[in-house]
């Protein structure tokens, strides 16, 4: 009898607790532009409650030090995991069919421990595929943008791209049309509901468009509502001549090679397994999901690597925060004015410029500006300069990839996720990775 009364009490308490979430759910519908009525409202509210319970449970484990990342409500809060997975529309066709090359590491320019292309004016703001399964097109376009913007380095950018700026210094850059890739690749066969492959998107621009690519404003994204016409409306007469000639594969399953490729070739297009609830609601920290698959046949989402680093913080702070910036802050290193003192300070880098001399600062040579405001961009270092300094002392922190998603800035860390690196190719990050060639 007492047990029955206790269970009944739990049921009532649970109902009251769940009902307390109704205002939160109503706020969520308003924030995300959702409109539900009648039975559908109650159904979505039930799903929201279930997801809320998962989020609360996971974050309690994080507070107890049992997991390295947090989760939070986002645009998927009223979706079941099955509905969410339907948005993941990366296909897995053989990636080697049209590769023009395979990655060969530059042994003379080894990758530093931390690197991030975002401060260098190469990476566009995070975009949003919305309800269309077009992740593959966003991933492929990001790789082509990365190659183009890296080569131009803010100079000689075509007039069609005059409205685009990248990075904290508003570096002139180009932003290309994902809608063109969706509509034109394989004659429009890869619609929102059928998915596609990143390398096919690159080959569409190279082979069928002859290297010409419309900008985002010339050919705007219209498939966010979940539909695409499959009608190619590319306008080659006004498109940018990109100089993109193909794509290169990075060695399957080799995270060391992937790190070097990410350092040398800006944005890397990759496929991952993003099917878990934990990815659906990821908020901050290094994503470490043992249930993630690491085989190429189970990759279901296309994203882009824009850098990598080592997390040395004792525990991630919950909730979304600013975009990740590996290494100490800009003011941590300039006082180390000798090469010996700089190299002895973990996280600081000694870099030389032929016209100015050596300086110590908190990002790898070629990634930031020194305290005199002189840019040390890798591809601008003149002959005879020191180039990247030796890596700092090994850290006991967690290795991660800086991954740019295409679900808008409200997801994750302003649209980004730190994914585990050097952890048995977790989530298949190194299974299907390519970069654009110029």
Task: Tell me what each language-model feature is.
Residues 14-318, 362, 377-438:
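Catalytic-core signature of thiol
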């Amino acid at each position: 009898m007492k047990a029955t009364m206790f269970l009944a009490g739990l049921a009532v308490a649970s109902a009251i607790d769940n009902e307390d979430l109704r205002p939160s759910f109503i706020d969520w519908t308003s924030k995300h532009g959702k409109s539900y009525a009648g039975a559908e409202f109650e159904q979505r509210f039930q799903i929201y409650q279930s997801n809320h319970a998962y989020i609360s449970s996971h974050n309690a484990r994080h507070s107890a030090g049992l997991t390295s990342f947090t989760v939070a409500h986002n645009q998927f809060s009223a979706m079941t995991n099955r509905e969410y997975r339907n948005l993941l529309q990366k296909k897995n066709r053989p990636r080697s069919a049209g590769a023009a090359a395979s990655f060969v590491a530059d042994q003379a320019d080894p990758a530093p421990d931390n690197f991030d292309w975002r401060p260098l004016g190469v990476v566009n703001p995070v975009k949003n595929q919305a309800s269309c399964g077009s992740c593959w097109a966003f991933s492929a376009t990001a790789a082509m943008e990365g190659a183009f913007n890296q080569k131009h380095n803010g100079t000689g950018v075509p007039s069609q791209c005059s409205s685009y700026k990248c990075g904290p210094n508003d570096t002139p850059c180009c932003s290309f049309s994902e809608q063109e890739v969706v509509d034109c690749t394989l004659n429009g066969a890869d619609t929102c509901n059928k998915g596609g492959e990143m390398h096919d998107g690159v080959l569409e621009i190279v082979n069928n468009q002859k290297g010409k690519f419309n900008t985002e404003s010339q050919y705007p994204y219209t498939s966010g509502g979940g539909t695409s016409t499959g009608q190619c409306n590319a306008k080659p007469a006004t498109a940018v001549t990109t100089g993109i000639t193909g794509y290169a594969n990075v060695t399957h399953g080799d995270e060391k090679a992937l790190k070097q490729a990410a350092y040398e070739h800006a944005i890397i297009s990759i496929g991952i397994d993003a099917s878990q609830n934990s990815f659906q609601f990821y908020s901050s920290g290094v994503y470490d999901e043992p249930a993630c698959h690491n085989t190429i046949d189970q990759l279901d989402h296309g994203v882009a690597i824009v850098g990598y680093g080592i997390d040395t913080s004792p525990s991630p702070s919950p909730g979304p925060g600013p975009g990740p910036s590996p290494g100490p802050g800009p003011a941590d290193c300039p006082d180390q004015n000798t090469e010996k003192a700089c190299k002895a300070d973990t996280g600081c880098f000694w870099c030389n410029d032929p016209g100015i001399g050596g300086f110590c600062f908190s990002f790898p040579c070629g990634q930031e500006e020194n305290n005199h405001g002189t840019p040390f961009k890798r591809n601008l270092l003149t002959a005879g300069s020191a180039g990247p300094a030796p890596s700092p002392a090994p850290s006991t922190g967690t290795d991660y990839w800086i991954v740019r998603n295409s679900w808008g800035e409200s997801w994750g860390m302003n649209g980004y996720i730190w994914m585990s690196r050097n952890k048995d190719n977790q989530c298949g990050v190194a299974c299907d990775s390519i970069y654009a060639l110029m």
